[in-house]
Amino acid sequence: MARYLGPKLKLSRREGTDLFLKSGVRAIDSKCKLETAPGQHGARKPRLSEYGTQLREKQKVRRIYGVLEKQFRNYYKEAARLKGNTGENLLQLLETRLDNVVYRMGFGSTRAEARQLVSHKSVMVNGRVVNIPSFKVSANDVVSIREKSRTQARIKAALEVAAQREKPTWVEVDAAKMEGAFKRLPERSDLSADINEQLIVELYSK
């Protein structure tokens, strides 16, 4: 399945919540009717079945992290093999993606922009260039912007936006040096309460 390249606000309206696909500090609900789905009949909210509710939650999380279906299923399989809560394991695995860590550190204003920085070889992990967005970042890894990429206006703009957001406690960032450390895996309480990962577990357990 190809990566979605259409309007980002439409995806947030489809899921009925801000997926943080647009850059900026403020939530998008002030300019987007999140309670109304896109399309001519968007105002008519269909009653979802149990399966439909589970599917919507999976799609929401998949779109937040910008992961394709096959990748997402593989993350679930890995999460199920790990000890502990499968749903929490899944979210932690998604959080260790390099593109997500770059976003969390504030070097990209969105995960899509962070993914592009990684793909364009603007990001290093422990001093080595890594251009794979799905690269798994481990505790104490140092993520930095390559020296020749540090003059990019979009990175500076992203850091300015990030300075106004609540900073994740599991990363430590030196904005002046454009580098940060991934200190630990985030706890479930660190992540969005708007995600119900148990619905995803129920969906894939069928």
From Swiss-Prot:
InterPro entries: Ribosomal_uS4 (IPR022801), Ribosomal_uS4_bac-type (IPR005709), Ribosomal_uS4_CS (IPR018079), Ribosomal_uS4_N (IPR001912), S4_RNA-bd (IPR002942), S4_RNA-bd_sf (IPR036986). GO terms for biological process: ribosomal small subunit biogenesis; translation. One of its GO terms (molecular function) is rRNA binding. The keyword Ubl conjugation does not apply. The keyword Cell membrane does not apply. Keywords: Ribonucleoprotein, Ribosomal protein, RNA-binding, rRNA-binding. Gene3D superfamilies: Ribosomal Protein S4 Delta 41, Chain A, domain 1, RNA-binding S4 domain. One of the primary rRNA binding proteins, it binds directly to 16S rRNA where it nucleates assembly of the body of the 30S subunit. With S5 and S12 plays an important role in translational accuracy. PANTHER family: 30S 40S RIBOSOMAL PROTEIN, SMALL RIBOSOMAL SUBUNIT PROTEIN US4M. HAMAP family: Ribosomal_uS4_B. Part of the 30S ribosomal subunit. Contacts protein S5. The interaction surface between S4 and S5 is involved in control of translational fidelity. This is Small ribosomal subunit protein uS4. It comes from Shewanella amazonensis (strain ATCC BAA-1098 / SB2B). The gene is rpsD.
